[in-house]
From Swiss-Prot:
It is an enzyme of class 2 (transferase). The lineage of its organism: Bacteria, Pseudomonadati, Pseudomonadota, Gammaproteobacteria, Pasteurellales. Pathway: Cell wall biogenesis; peptidoglycan recycling. ATP binds at residues 4-11, 133-140. Keywords: ATP-binding, Carbohydrate metabolism, Kinase, Metal-binding, Nucleotide-binding, Transferase, Zinc. This is N-acetyl-D-glucosamine kinase. Gene3D superfamilies: 3.30.420.40. It catalyses: N-acetyl-D-glucosamine + ATP = N-acetyl-D-glucosamine 6-phosphate + ADP + H(+). Catalyzes the phosphorylation of N-acetyl-D-glucosamine (GlcNAc) derived from cell-wall degradation, yielding GlcNAc-6-P. It comes from Pasteurella multocida (strain Pm70). Zn(2+) binds at H157, C178, C180, C185. HAMAP family: GlcNAc_kinase. It comes from the Bacteria. The keyword Hydrolase does not apply. Its EC number is 2.7.1.59.
């Protein structure tokens, strides 16, 4: 069996999958926030419970809101204080007596989609999350590309370029501070939160993303104008990723991925932002939704 964990700041979810990545069982518990020992023991208890339930010793994959440096084994998980700057892989392997693998949760999302039967034909899959933040993961031949420090795919912490700033008003463009310490990171613009902040600052009215989209479909001209601008901003930013990575398919997840107009408008806007010889990759909506993280974590032990 394949055990996949989604490690969040408020909850830890375990899901058990068979070798075909079909879910057999799942359980959620609260995330211990202060005690590292309690955090480790929570995961260990869930693993042992699954072992007993399925009469096997399953593989253990973790999806975390951060990364583990491959060189040092130290986790960087700033919103889970109990496990931040701790050797989580080594300590879990010692307690469980088996190999443990961990990846950023956006990488796990992308890996889950890459292992879908419809996407398995593609050698490269770029997963992008337009949710609370903007993140991504790159999959080559069914494997996560993590980079030398585990930080590959942190597309949300690249910054707006010249064309994006001009689109947003040049010297008058809204510039947002990012939690990483930089300014004008894509995380603060292409996320659901960024969508709302941009509308507020450019249209002078604070609305939820859902309300903005409802106005767009109702034909409200301020919403229509804003959405077209946002699509162009996505085309500039995602176009840069396509130029560098040249993926076969892009899968979108997160709350804004439910905005169906994206799949109509973005492919039309992208060619103007790419080299003439480039192909616009297939852009599609994620299939697994909230289950993508645990499913991708379980897939960390699969290979083509």
């Amino acid at each position: 069996m394949r055990y996949g964990f989604d490690i969040g700041g408020t909850k830890i979810e375990l899901a058990v999958f068979n070798d075909q990545l079909e879910k057999q069982y799942s359980e959620r518990v609260e995330t211990p926030k202060e005690s590292y020992e309690e955090w480790l023991n929570t995961i260990v208890r869930l693993v042992h419970k699954a072992d007993e339930m399925f009469q096997c010793q399953g593989t253990v994959g973790l999806g975390i809101p951060g990364f583990v440096n491959p060189a040092t084994g130290i986790a960087e998980i700033v919103n889970i204080r109990a496990a931040d700057h701790k050797p989580i892989i080594q300590d879990l392997e010692t307690r469980l007596g088996r190999e443990v693998r961990a990846e950023n949760d956006a990488n796990c999302f992308a890996l889950s989609e890459a292992w879908d039967e419809e996407n398995a034909q593609y050698p490269s899959v770029l997963g992008l999350i337009l949710g609370t933040g903007f993140g991504g993961g790159l999959i080559f031949n069914g494997k996560v590309h993590s980079g030398q420090t585990g930080m590959a795919g942190e597309v949300g912490h690249t910054q707006l370029n010249y064309h994006a700033l001009r689109l947003l008003g040049g010297d008058n463009a809204p510039i947002y501070d990012c939690g990483c310490g930089n300014r004008a990171c894509l995380d603060t613009y292409l996320s659901g939160r960024g969508f709302e902040m941009l509308y507020r600052d450019m249209q002078g009215e604070a609305l939820s993303a859902q309300a903005i989209i409802q106005r767009f479909y109702a034909g409200d001209q301020s919403a229509v104008k804003f959405v077209e601008l946002f699509i162009e901003l996505c085309a500039i930013s995602i176009g840069n990723l396509i130029t560098v990575l040249d993926p076969h398919v892009i899968v979108l997840g997160g709350g804004l991925s439910n905005f169906d107009y994206l799949y109509e408008a973005l492919p039309k806007a992208l060619p103007a932002r790419l080299l003439r010889s480039a192909n616009v990759p297939l852009i599609k909506k994620a299939k697994y939704g909230d289950s993508g993280g645990v499913r991708g974590a379980a897939a960390l032990f699969l290979s083509k």
